Each structure stands twice: as structure tokens, then as C-alpha cells.
Swiss-Prot record:
Residues 410-485 form the B5 domain. The gene is pheT. Its EC number is 6.1.1.20. This is Phenylalanine--tRNA ligase beta subunit. Gene3D superfamilies: 3.30.56.10, Bira Bifunctional Protein, Domain 2 (3.30.930.10), Ferrodoxin-fold anticodon-binding domain (3.30.70.380), Nucleic acid-binding proteins (2.40.50.140), Phenylalanyl-trna Synthetase, Chain B, domain 3 (3.50.40.10).
């Protein structure tokens, strides 16, 4: 909202400088984006009177003008504007003047003819194209009235005025009119605004005999008023009105339309004027209703719009003539030939106006105000003021009476609260009288009954709803800078992470330490992806009632598909060596509740090379054992109650049937690890890709609650190596479990150090070599004790697996 400082002074006895006033406004809660004076930087620009205008002897578009600029002799100025003519009062930049963008104008020659300055358009002295009257956009500006030559143009064009640009939040729509801003400034400066009463001089013709109106549904337009003017003359507005408009960022059009915009700026109430003679029938009829499917409307910007049954329209009983609260129709536009005018002032349904403006891409000053709300008490006041001014400027007659099919009466809003609560909330020691004074400065009526305050809110402040709003108003005027600063009080407590939080943090640290990079995927996906790689029993994915897109309609039940999408994205950009993980929640349905359970999972993905090629080493591709080793490291970090075991599985159609293992902690299934199915890899353009997915919620339940530290052993370990030739179907886990079963109480670890299949080994068999480590924590082991335990292991392996000791 651009606020004219001079316009404010029409209502307030202001003495505070504009910059200081802007600072005060900002400190009370309305941000001031800028304070500007359009004349700043300009020099030696005056009003000139064109005495004569002749064609340039050496040009088909230039004119040689004699211009009275208040000097002893007229100045000869060459001008290229197509609309320059003798008798005009124009803007003249004298020699050595400064115009917009710090351009200096000098005496010069144009095609051999001396030119003593420049006749200017508004844009050349700093006006935006959007506020220049259309008839002057491509030419010079012509003053609509005579002004003494040589007079500085700044005052005449309103350029000496200071414009305070308010950056309003949606709740302060009351400041979208100069009256609302005047009330705000009056409260800040402890002043009383003085507004003139509106008086309308009416003719003997009754409006109701010329015009009728109806509103199909009161919800569409709770308030709807119409007035009528007859025998008006459409002409340019006086200069004072044009300056008020362009200083507010609005283009002047003609005296009737300019009045509606002026009243919108004054009261914050949008108005619209219809050419009454364009409406069908002798007795004019206005109807407010929802549009019908198939109806069209060409708006004032000459764009045609296909209307929907959610658009509120104004009709003449037959066809739409305006989009209510947004923009008028081209078919009822005020033109130079308009003689009779209907003025509309209304309150339209805010949500409907907002949706219509968005749907048709027609954001306007009017729609912005209707969306945020308008002052119920000022609707007819603005209408009456507009009618009176139109009659004055257009020399027309206002018919008697207002047609009002709906009229929402202002409802007094009363808020009661304990004055002590204000001090509790603000941390102040403010007296009750101070609170009352602050509220009365805002124009609120206050009654005090034993420090219980009853505040009556004026209709212009419809943003005040509850006690907290009133307390905020007190704080604003009291001054946020005056509120005392206090340190928080209370007992100091030591923060700590829960067991679960520690485990989750340890998970991230472990995986990042192993070289994986964290990824974050959308929790919403497609139905197909939601059901893949699921650790839980097959179930239906949870679907959103109102999804944003079909690709984000279901809640995920796994993390792997998100990692695959991330991998495919990277591969498409030539990044093929990938190591990613994601820790997050999946959503699993539960039979006893409508909403799904949120379960903590962690998943990882590796593809490409784990070791890039260098001058020392060849490239090493990722394989099953690479990712299984990472899972082993991760599982070891949890201090689990039972051993971790891997069992081959082909139960997952998305996984390679021969390179996938189910992961167990004791007897509890907690996840999978393995290679994704080649078909899925091909579909996503990935090389061999390995993944793991773990149910962290289950794993955290299987942690030991305490960790017992052991001292370093005092006695030496003893190791024995054994190489076994076994059938290929025998797994490492089978052999390790068998060794531990018969290893005796001194066996502390078993590690595989070699696997071989090839020459010197029968087909269908392989060689696996292990190191067995023995330790007695209380004494040194003897050879006899170790050999006896080792021989039991060998005998058991031979008997169980038909193993051959090599």
C-alpha cells in the first residue's frame, strides 16, 4: 500500500517528518518497505506553454516549438512527440537540467535546428509506464489545466509528496485504505483524525424506479448496494485527482473510473461503475449469482474467460457483465459516450473471489481487498462519497435512494479480559490507565470494572478477534522496545539422548564411516513401489485421500525403492559408483487402527566400483560380500542379545534368487541383504546393484541393556588352522556354527581366511580354510588341551559334512 504523506495530512495534524514517521510505523508492527520522493534528483524542470508548433524543415516527424517557460523570451525546442501542439501546457526540461536516471539535458541542435531543452513525457521524469494515462504513454504529457509558465512541475504533479510504501501482512487489510492508515498513525502519534461527513445531493428521480437488483444467495454477497447517476460527462480527471492516483500506483483513466479507484484508496472499499445504457431493458436489472457452465465473459483487459459454476458474476438479468470482486466486463465499460452510470459497492465471499482470481489469472487491487476483508461499516459510506464526487466532477445528477438487496449490519465485537493478564503476558508492570489510554488511542471503547476491561472493537478492525489480539495492540503501541528483557528462570537439567536416539545416531555414524552417503527420499510413492522389498508380511499400502500427484499417492512400506530412484537419477548423470543409505520411517497398516504404524527402517545401496582404478590398484567392483560386510559391522554396533545369522532366501521377487540372504538375530527376522533382480537393474539402467534393508525397530528391541567391560587377557591365545574340502552347497555359516558347537569353552573366535575352487579340487566341491582361536582367561592353555578341543571339531566336521581335511 503506497501512502501519500500529504494525503495523510488532510486528516491529521502531522508534524513528524516522513522518514521519522516511517520508522515509528515500522516499530509498531507494520513494515515500511520504502520512503520515496519522486522529485529527488531532478533539477530545472518547469511548466511550459507551447506558443507555436511548426514542422521541422528537415524531418517528417520532428516539430519546432516556441515555448514560454517563464523567461523573458520563449525557448525554441525541437520535439519528436506525435501529440505536441500549440496551446498546450507541457513539462519542459531546461538546459542543464536533470531528468530521470540522472540524465543531463543540454542545449543542442537537432538536424540543424537549435533546441533549448526538452519537452518531456511522464516516463522521462521518473513515472512508471503503468501509471501514465494511456493517451500519453507514447507522447508528452499535457496538463489538463492552465498553469503559470516557469512553475516547477514537481508540486503540480505531486512529485514533492513523500510516498510511504507499507508492506502489509494479510491480517492488516484495514490499512489498505488511507482512512485505515490515518487511524493507525493517529494512534502512534496520539492524534485525532478528522474526516469530513459525506453528503449526497440527490435528484427527484427515484433509483428504485430506474433500477432493481437481487442476490441469488446471500452468502455470495452479504452486502450489495447500488446507486445511479444520470446525465454525466466523461472527461479527464482534474490534476489533483490524477496525482493522488499515480502516487498510489494506479493509472488515471477518466473522471468516473478514477473516482471509484480514489474511493478504494480512501476507504479500502472496492467500487465498480457500469455504463447503465449497456444493460438490457428500460428498467435496469442487476443480479448477483453463480455463473452457469458454458457462459463466457470478456473482461476490461479484453481477455475472454470461460466461466465455471464456482465464479460469482454480476449480470444484467441475461448475461454476465462483471466477475464479482475481480474485474468488470468489457460490455459494460465506462466510455467517452457514457451518460448514465450505476455504481456498485459490495462485500463478496472472500474465498470465492480468491479462487476466481486464481482460476482466471486476474489478480487486481479489488480482488486483493475482497480476499482479505473490507470494513462493513464503510461500504455505503464509500458508495455515497463516490456518487457525490462523480456528480461534482461529471456534472451529473445522483438519483434518490440506494438499491440494497442485501445489507450486512456491522456487529459490535466485545472482548473482556483481566488487565493483570496483560502484564503477565508482556512481562510488564503497566498500569490499568496506561492500557486504557493505549486502547483509546486506537479508537477502541474501553470500560473498566475493578480492573476487568471490556473493549468494544470498531468494525474497521475486523482482525481483532480474541484477547491475545487486544494484548498485541497494547504491546504495539506501548512499544516493543519498551518491553523488559528477562532471562528465563527454572532448574537447569542435563540433556541426554534416549537409547533409541543413540542407536539411530550410531547407525548413521557407522554407515557413513563405511563410506555410504545419506539420502532422503519422498515418503510418498506409487502403489507398485510401495509394495516392493517389504520386510513385513504382504499387505496393502496406505493411499492418500487427496494426493498431489499419482506418483505420490501411497505411503511407502520400504526404503529401497527410494534409494533405487536416487541411484537411477545419479546414473542418468554419469555417476555410476554409488554407496547410499537412508534411515527413515515406513508405514505399515494395522488391522486394529485406521492409520498405519510408523516403523523405523534403515536401508543401503551399493553399485559400481567400491575401489576406483588407480596406478597402484585395479578397480574393485561391489559384490555381495562388500555389502554383507557393512551389514556385519552395523549389526555388531548394536550389542545384540543373540547372534546374527544369514539364511539364503528366494522369497523376494525383486531380489536375485541366488544372491539374497535373510538376516536373523537369534530366531527373529530383521532384514534382507543381497543383489537386486537383474530385471529391476535393467529397468533402472543400473549395473549389478546390492542392497540391504533392516527393521531398526526390531533390532533396537534386541539390544542388550548394559555393556559389560572385560579386562584385556593376561594369558596368550593359541590358534589352529584347518582347511576343509566340502560340497559347494555347504555355506560358511554352516561350518562356523558347527565349529562353535564343538569348539569347547576355550574357543573364542572362528575366521574364514581362504576359499578356493578349481584345479586339484573335485568338481562340485570347494576348499574353505579357517583360523580357530583359543583362550583361557585364567591360565595358559597347554598343547594337550588345545589339541583335544581341535580334534573334536575336526571329527564333527568330517562326520557332519563329509568334509576332507586338506
Amino acid at each position: 500500500m503506497k501512502v501519500s504523506y500529504n494525503w495523510l495530512k488532510d486528516y491529521l495534524d502531522l508534524t513528524t517528518a516522513p522518514e521519522a514517521l516511517a520508522e515509528k510505523i515500522t516499530r509498531t508492527g507494520i513494515e515500511v518497505a520504502d520512503v520515496a520522493q519522486m522529485s529527488a534528483g531532478l533539477k530545472k524542470i518547469v511548466v511550459g506553454h507551447v506558443l507555436s508548433c511548426e514542422p521541422h524543415p528537415d524531418s517528417d516527424h520532428l516539430h519546432v516549438c516556441e515555448v514560454d517557460v517563464g523567461e523573458e523570451e520563449p525557448f525554441q525546442i525541437v520535439c519528436g512527440a506525435p501529440n505536441v501542439a500549440a496551446g498546450q501546457y507541457v513539462i519542459v526540461a531546461l538546459p542543464n537540467s536533470r531528468i530521470a536516471d540522472n540524465v543531463k539535458i543540454k542545449k543542442g541542435k537537432m538536424r540543424g535546428v537549435v533546441s533549448m531543452g526538452m519537452i518531456c513525457g511522464l516516463q522521462e521524469i521518473g513515472f512508471a509506464d503503468s501509471v501514465v494515462p494511456k493517451e500519453y504513454v507514447d507522447g508528452i504529457f499535457v496538463f489538463p489545466e492552465a498553469i503559470a509558465p516557469g512553475t516547477d512541475v514537481y508540486e503540480a504533479l505531486g512529485m514533492t509528496d513523500y510516498i510511504i510504501d507499507l508492506d502489509l501482512t494479510a491480517n492488516r487489510a484495514d490499512a489498505l485504505g488511507i482512512h485505515g492508515v490515518a487511524h493507525e498513525v493517529a494512534a502512534i502519534e496520539s492524534l485525532t483524525p478528522h474526516f469530513e461527513d459525506v453528503a449526497v445531493s440527490e435528484s427527484d428521480v427515484q433509483t428504485k424506479n430506474q433500477l432493481s437488483a437481487q442476490v441469488a444467495d446471500e452468502q455470495l454477497a452479504p452486502t450489495y448496494h447500488l446507486r445511479m447517476l444520470q446525465n454525466v460527462t466523461v472527461q479527464p480527471s482534474p490534476l489533483w485527482l490524477q496525482t493522488r492516483l499515480w502516487n498510489a500506483g494506479i493509472r488515471p483513466i477518466n473522471n468516473l473510473v478514477d473516482v471509484t479507484n480514489y474511493m478504494m484508496l480512501t476507504y479500502g472499499q472496492p467500487l465498480h461503475a457500469f455504463d447503465a445504457d449497456t444493460l438490457t431493458g428500460d428498467h435496469k436489472q442487476i443480479e448477483v449469482r453463480l455463473a452457469k457452465t458454458g457462459e463466457k465473459l470478456t473482461t476490461l483487459d479484453e481477455a475472454e474467460h470461460d466461466l465455471t459454476n464456482e465464479d460469482i458474476v454480476i449480470t444484467d438479468g441475461n448475461q454476465p457483465i462483471a466477475l464479482a470482486g475481480v474485474m468488470g466486463g468489457f460490455n459494460s465499460e465506462i466510455t467517452a459516450n457514457t451518460k448514465n452510470v450505476i455504481i456498485e459497492a459490495a462485500i463478496f465471499a472472500p474465498t470465492a473471489v480468491r479462487k476466481t482470481a486464481q482460476r482466471h489469472n486476474l489478480r487486481s487491487d479489488a480482488s486483493s481487498r475482497f480476499e482479505k476483508g473490507v470494513n462493513v461499516a464503510d461500504v455505503q459510506v464509500a458508495l455515497d462519497a463516490a456518487a457525490a464526487m462523480m456528480a461534482e466532477l461529471g456534472a451529473g445528477q445522483v438519483t434518490a435512494g440506494v438499491v440494497s438487496p442485501t445489507n450486512l449490519a456491522p456487529q459490535p465485537k466485545v472482548i473482556q479480559f483481566d488487565s493483570a493478564r496483560v502484564n503477565r503476558v508482556l512481562g510488564t508492570d503497566m498500569s490499568v490507565q496506561t492500557m486504557i489510554n493505549l486502547l483509546e488511542r486506537l479508537g477502541f471503547e474501553v470500560a473498566n470494572n475493578a480492573d476487568q476491561l471490556t473493549v468494544t472493537i470498531p468494525a474497521r478492525r475486523w482482525d481483532i478477534e480474541i484477547q491475545a489480539d487486544v494484548i498485541e495492540e497494547i504491546a504495539r503501541l506501548y512499544g516493543y522496545d519498551n518491553l523488559p528483557s528477562t532471562l528465563p528462570t527454572g532448574d537447569m537439567t542435563t540433556g541426554a539422548l534416549t537409547t533409541e536416539q543413540k542407536a539411530l545416531r550410531r547407525t548413521r555414524h557407522t554407515l557413513e564411516g563405511a563410506g555410504l552417503t545419506q539420502a532422503i527420499s519422498y515418503a510418498l510413492t506409487t502403489e507398485e513401489k510401495a509394495g516392493q522389498f517389504t520386510l513385513a508380511a504382504k499387505q496393502t499400502a496406505t493411499v492418500l485421500d487427496w494426493p498431489m500427484t499419482q506418483d505420490h499417492a501411497y505411503l511407502r512400506m520400504n526404503l529401497v525403492t527410494g534409494l533405487l530412484d536416487d541411484a537411477a537419477y545419479n546414473v542418468a548423470r554419469k555417476q555410476t559408483d554409488l554407496a547410499l543409505y537412508e534411515q527413515g520411517r515406513v508405514f505399515l497398516q494395522h488391522a486394529d487402527q485406521a492409520r498405519p504404524n510408523e516403523v523405523e527402517y534403515v536401508a543401503g545401496l551399493m553399485s559400481g566400483n567400491r575401489q576406483v582404478k588407480s596406478w597402484q590398484e585395479a578397480a574393485a567392483p561391489v559384490d555381495f560380500y562388500t555389502i554383507k560386510g557393512i551389514v556385519d559391522t552395523l549389526m555388531a554396533s548394536y550389542n545384540l542379545q543373540a547372534a546374527v545369522a544369514y539364511q539364503a532366501t528366494d522369497a523376494y521377487p525383486e531380489m536375485h534368487p541366488g544372491r539374497t540372504a535373510a538376516i536373523y538375530v537369534g530366531e527373529t527376522f530383521v532384514g534382507i541383504v543381497g543383489q537386486i533382480h537383474p530385471k529391476i537393474a535393467k529397468a533402472t539402467h543400473l549395473k549389478e546393484t546390492y542392497i540391504f534393508e533392516l527393521d531398526l525397530a526390531k533390532i533396537l528391541e534386541l539390544q542388550r541393556q548394559t555393556i559389560i567391560a572385560k579386562p584385556a587377557p593376561k594369558f596368550p591365545e593359541v590358534t589352529r588352522d584347518i582347511a576343509l574340502q566340502v560340497p559347494e552347497a555347504i555355506t560358511n555359516a554352516d561350518l562356523v556354527n558347527a565349529i562353535k558347537e564343538k569348539g569347547g569353552r576355550y574357543l573364542v573366535s572362528v575366521s574364514l581366511f581362504d576359499v578356493y575352487a578349481g584345479s586339484h579340487i573335485e568338481a562340485g566341491e570347494k576348499s574353505m580354510a579357517y583360523t580357530l582361536t583359543y583362550l583361557n582367561e585364567d591360565a595358559t592353555l597347554t598343547e594337550e588341551e588345545v589339541n583335544a578341543a581341535f580334534e573334536k571339531v575336526v571329527a564333527h566336521l568330517v562326520a557332519t559334512f563329509q568334509a576332507k581335511v586338506r
